[in-house]
């Protein structure tokens, strides 16, 4: 039962959606609704107006950008679609793996790429995969379209009057992998990691063990050049500031820091094996 009252509009196109967001204080975007609707029911969030963008075809589909250098993943692409898309599987496998690991089939069928990225909390999988891929998000707002690094989006909320329209991922990216340990009941990550091995060194992003999804540049620097033996990876994690890792439900910060280090070593070794093929 939703206890608060609000208005509801289903805009015909993106321009109408943007006008509604700009013209109504307290307007919120409704897409998959996996985070917003439970929060409205519980009273954790409020809205004066729900702008339902679920039928905006322009925000769907996975394509290549005109110059062929990036994949453009529409914000309304569901997690189930992302997990099985041939282009994503071939060129951004950590994104497909993160989508597969997200929740149960019902969550994946309803949840969207845009919603998962905007949520960007401690218990979301897709932001770390996007950060490891060096992806950017495309935002549409009153001033036109802009881009923002996925890492910057995870650090703070998107503008309230903007709509996340797409995720842009470098095409044919370097070897990558995603690993996760999840709560059996909720499928929320206890911790998760995504990695890519680039010519300049590894890119590593983690969630669950930290207060929000983070790139671990200190760990990346310590591991530059590899090889990615488990003990070397764990030593790189132990060198991080103790306060970086935060306790979870029934788990200590020290344990989570160790666990995410083990997962990162596993992911790096898988990506390294792919690089050798």
Residue spans for each PLM region:
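C-terminal structural segment of proteins
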Residues: 1-277
């Amino acid at each position: 039962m939703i206890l608060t009252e609000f208005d509801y509009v289903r805009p015909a196109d993106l321009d109408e959606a943007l006008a509604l967001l700009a013209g109504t204080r307290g307007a919120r975007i409704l897409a998959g609704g996996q985070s917003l609707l439970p929060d409205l029911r519980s009273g954790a969030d409020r809205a004066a107006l729900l702008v339902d963008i679920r039928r905006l075809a322009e925000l769907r589909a996975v394509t290549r950008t005109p110059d062929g250098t990036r994949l453009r993943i529409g914000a309304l692409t569901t997690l189930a679609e992302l997990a099985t898309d041939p282009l994503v599987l071939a060129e951004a496998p950590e994104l497909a793996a993160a989508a597969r690991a997200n929740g149960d089939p019902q969550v994946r069928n309803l949840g969207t790429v845009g919603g998962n990225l905007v949520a960007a909390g401690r218990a979301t999988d897709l932001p770390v995969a996007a950060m490891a891929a060096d992806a950017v998000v495309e935002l549409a707002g009153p001033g036109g379209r802009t881009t923002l690094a996925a890492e910057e989006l995870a650090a703070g909320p998107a503008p309230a009057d903007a709509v996340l329209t797409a995720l842009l991922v470098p095409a044919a990216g370097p070897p990558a992998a995603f690993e996760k340990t999840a709560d059996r009941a909720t499928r929320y990550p206890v911790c998760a990691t995504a990695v890519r091995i680039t010519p300049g060194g590894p890119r590593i992003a983690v969630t669950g063990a930290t207060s929000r999804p983070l790139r671990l540049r200190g760990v990346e620097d310590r591991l530059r050049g590899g090889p990615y033996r488990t003990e070397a990876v764990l030593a790189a994690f132990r060198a991080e500031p103790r306060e970086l890792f935060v306790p979870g439900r029934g788990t200590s910060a020290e344990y989570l820091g160790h666990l995410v280090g083990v997962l990162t070593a596993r992911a790096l070794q898988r990506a390294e094996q792919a690089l050798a093929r």
